[in-house]
Regions:
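Surface-exposed molecular-recognition determinants
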Residues: 1-139
Length: 139
């Protein structure tokens, strides 16, 4: 089974309460080969009316990640620009049985922590992220 397509990726929060987000760059593509889904995402915001609460995530993945707690997916490539100083994402994690990815950062102790919504800038040409990742689906 082979499939190619596009999907709509969006910034959101773990609480699901981000305000209106306007994007000046927003592309997302996938290739599905068997049960593996290869994705590329590019998001850059022009404005965010309200950051909301919780931590930052990207929603709208084209297929649900396999429902297996041992089958988490991480990014194979991640590039970021125009985030709040010292608060840019350094990795992603797609939780099992979901269609979203949570964003993470390295803190001053080099521990990986969830990226707080305070890291989101609300101005133009901000929160630029480019991701390539692979994950498994049961579909």
């Amino acid at each position: 089974d082979y499939e190619e397509g596009t999907f709509t990726a969006s910034y959101n929060t773990t609480a699901g309460n981000i305000g209106t987000v306007t994007y000046d760059a927003r592309t997302a593509r996938y290739t599905k080969i068997g049960r593996l889904v290869y994705i590329t995402i590019r998001l850059r915001t022009d404005s965010i009316s309200d950051r909301g609460t919780g931590n930052v995530r990207i929603t709208g993945l084209p297929f649900t990640h396999v429902n297996n707690a041992n089958a988490r997916a991480v990014s194979t490539n991640l590039h970021t620009a125009a985030w709040t100083a010292d608060d840019s994402p350094t990795s992603i994690l797609i939780q099992h049985n979901t269609t979203y990815m949570n964003l993470y950062q390295k803190d001053y102790n080099q521990d990986t922590t969830a990226l707080p919504v305070a890291a989101l800038n609300t101005g133009a040409n901000d929160n630029d992220i480019r991701i390539s990742a692979v994950y498994e689906t049961s579909q």
